Amino acid sequence: MTMSLITIAVELTPGKEVRSAIQQGLFDANVKATGDGHFDAVCVTARDADATVIGGVVGEAYWGWVNFTTVWVHPDHRRQGIASRMLKLAEAEAARLGYTQAYLDTFSFQSPDLYLRAGYEVFGQLDHFPAGAQRLFMRKTLLSQMPEPMSGNTPQRDIG
């Protein structure tokens, strides 16, 4: 039996192909272990009168859960309930797609009360991340009710 040489090294600037190979390898292993490679993207945006994106929620959904990875509102539009409404609509979309649970992580300086008011509970915390702050991990069971879209229009879906 011939043993091939394996080199293990730090790559300071890994290219897209390196990251893609690693991510695809993990994805393939997960599909093999679970038999389920289904994935849905959830995205809700808020736009101003000029159709400029002034906020959004981005989520990745699989295995019954949606992970809201990004929730953002432009500073000029904060404290108007936009984040709450977008989050509620994103949760409803995930529920419509069949997902029953949501999770996210946030920092103590990123308005964690928004998520607590929305019914999320903290299930983990990392102190001093960054120094003087905490990173909070939250989860919620989703309800299957559809909130009103922000503009009164029906949600748009990018099919394709």
Mark where each language-model region is:
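Acetyl-CoA-dependent GNAT
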Residues: I6-T69, H74, F109, G124, ...
